Structures are given as structure tokens and as C-alpha cells.
Amino acid sequence: MVKVNIGGCSSFVKDAEYKAYVEKALSAFDVLESEKGAGNDFLGWKHLPSETPESLVKACEDIRDDWKSKNIDLVIVIGIGGSYLGAKCAIEALSHSFAKELHSKDVPQVVFAGNNLSEEYISELIDLMQVRNAACVVISKSGTTTETAVAFRIVKQHLEETY
């Protein structure tokens, strides 16, 4: 259980207000743990890595091997919001702080698209794609997010023209 010391906040947060929020937080936690609330079909992450299907591990290894054989040195992660931030946080949390500097020739550079539709950013991404062997990963819960869809179409068009 997480414990929070709000002693310094007592002049700003009334005791009754705090207790009401604690009740709401505990209720939300119970719904999450029971996996019966809205969005319950999107809770597969709760069981990782202990319940990762071997077929998923194999599929990831196959993609890795395929990309290595094609000398992929640029991976474009396309997503927005939690889709983009989840990937970015996982990469940063699991990587050496200076991974790019230490392993620049062994590990593909990871860049992001869809979170920023500035025309300059997209143009610069295409410049980068023109001098690198690129692959992309699209992350979208709904598949209908405008920014993700636009970025994917642009990246896909360039990849099709290149390969």
C-alpha cells in the first residue's frame, strides 16, 4: 500500500475533503484490481511480464531478427498521448542513460511521430528517413486518432517509395 504524508497540506486540504478523495482512490483501485470497470479490455499490461505469452515473445524476436537482417537503424514509433508516452517511458526506463552514445552502431535510433504534427518536424523526419534504413511501430488504442493516422500515412508513403 502506498502511504502519503500530507501533514504540510493540512492548512490547504480539509480533513473531510482528504478522506473523500482517499475513498474515491481506493474505490478506483478496487475497480482496477477487479478488472470489471470501463476499459477493462485494456488491462493486459497488468499481467506483464509474468503472463507474457510465448507466442508474443517469439513474434518480437522474429521482428528483431528481421530488422537486424535488413540493417534497420531507425525505428519510428507512431502514437500520441499515452501510446507515445508509454513507449517513450519504457525505453527510457529500461535503457542505459547513454545508450545512444555507447551502442550507436548496434542499436537502432528510436524517434517518435504523431505526437507532433508540425510541418517542420515531419519534414525533418523525412530527411532522416532518406539517409537511414527505417521501420515503424504504430501504437493506437482506437486506430482512429487523427494525429497518429496522419503521421502513419506520411511515414508509410515514404517507406513504400523507398522500399
Where are these regions (language model features)?
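Extended, charge-enriched "interface" segments that sit outside catalytic cores
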Residues: M1-N71
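Glycine-rich phosphate-binding loops that contact phosphosugars or nucleotide phosphates
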Residues: D65, S69-Y163
